Every structure is written in C-alpha cells, then in structure tokens.
Curated annotation (Swiss-Prot):
Its main location: host cell. Residues 91-104 have a biased composition (Polar residues). The keyword Glycoprotein applies. It comes from Rotavirus A (strain RVA/Cow/United States/WC3/1981/G6P7[5]). Transmembrane segments: none annotated. One of its GO terms (biological process) is viral genome replication. This is Non-structural protein 5.
Length: 198
C-alpha cells in the first residue's frame, strides 16, 4: 500500500491596497464637499424651538431627545451624516454650526477609501494505490521454519520428543532431555512468580 500526495499549488494570499475606489466625494471639515445623499440642519436654538413646538407632546419620543440636554441632542442629530452604502464612510462636523457651549460635540473628519483584495487558491491531488504482493509473501512463507507448539503436558517426564523438534532428528531421547525439562520447569515457575508479584 502506497500513499502519494501531490500539492501543485499552495494557498497564496496577495494583498493589494487600491485607492480612490469610493464613488463619493471625500468629506472635509468645511462641509462644502458632501455626498449626494448627505443632509445638514443648522443646529441653532431658534431652529430647535421651531422643531420642538411643531410637534405635539404625544409625538415626541426617545429619538427627539437622545441626551439630557435637548439642545445638545438636536446638535448631535443635525450634525449626523446620512449616507448610503455606495457613498462610502464619511463623518463631518462643521465648526461654524457648533453651539456656543461646545458640550457633547467632537470634531471628526474620517474618510475610508482603501481596500484589501485577497486571493487564495488550493490545488491538490491525492492518489492511493493498494497493490498486494502475493508472490513475495509466498516466498517468505516457505523460508520460515515451523516449530512445534508446546503441549500442555510437555513438562511431564513421560513426554517424548519426536523428530520434528530438531532439524535432523538427532535429539530424540538424548541425555540432555531431562535436564532441559527441569530447567524449563524452573523457568516457568519463576515467570509465574514474577507475574504474581506484579
């Protein structure tokens, strides 16, 4: 069985920064250059009074007072830029339209007109081949020597070895037979004692 993996192309990530992709005009602090869907309202006290008096008390909700200071809330909402997804990201705050207290107003000018392109490709192939080599296994099987299995009663004195225990059959009833059995019995007892101790 063989396993081969061929990876032709590792994942490659290429990043490129491109400019001027946004279709909207870049925002400036002066508020002169704005997108097509942006709107501004002059946040003065007179306009705020007209706005609040034009609504009935039942129609005034949480969106009309986003903070504890109504004038600050109106200034925050009027300075917010309305834009769509195609116009990019732009936030403008004009210095001329700030209230005299400067409470709750932060001057922000932010434009995002950069992007990152990523490309990742992975091409790989895996091939598995299972070829059984039967001829080699047969030759290995023939070259092995087959030894007899040890019988359960092989430690007894009346157990007689036959010619298959040796290569040329010369160990049948030899003088070392009883010494061999005695040694094997002692080794077996030592092994059993070690197993019990563990």
């Amino acid at each position: 069985m063989s396993l081969s993996i061929d990876v032709t192309s590792l994942p490659s990530i290429s990043s490129s920064i491109y400019k001027n992709e946004s279709s909207s005009t870049t925002s400036t602090l002066s508020g002169k250059s704005i997108g097509r869907s942006e709107q501004y309202i002059s946040p003065d006290a007179e306009a705020f009074s007209k706005y609040m008096l034009s609504k009935s008390p039942e129609d005034i909700g949480p969106s009309d007072s986003a903070s504890n200071d109504p004038l600050t809330s109106f200034s925050i909402r009027s300075n917010a830029v309305k834009t769509n997804a195609d116009a990019g990201v732009s936030m403008d705050s004009s210095t001329q339209s700030r209230p005299s207290s400067n409470v709750g107003c932060d001057q922000v000018d932010f434009s995002f007109n950069k992007g990152i392109k990523m490309n990742a490709n992975l091409d790989s192939s895996i091939s598995i081949s299972t070829i059984s080599k039967k001829e080699k296994s047969k030759s290995d099987h023939k070259s092995r020597k087959h030894y007899p299995k040890i019988e359960a009663e092989s430690d007894s004195d009346d157990y007689v070895l036959d010619d298959s225990d040796s290569d040329d059959g010369k160990c049948k009833n030899c003088k070392y037979k009883r010494k061999y059995f005695a040694l094997r019995m002692r080794m077996k007892q030592v092994a059993m004692q070690l197993i019990e101790d563990l």
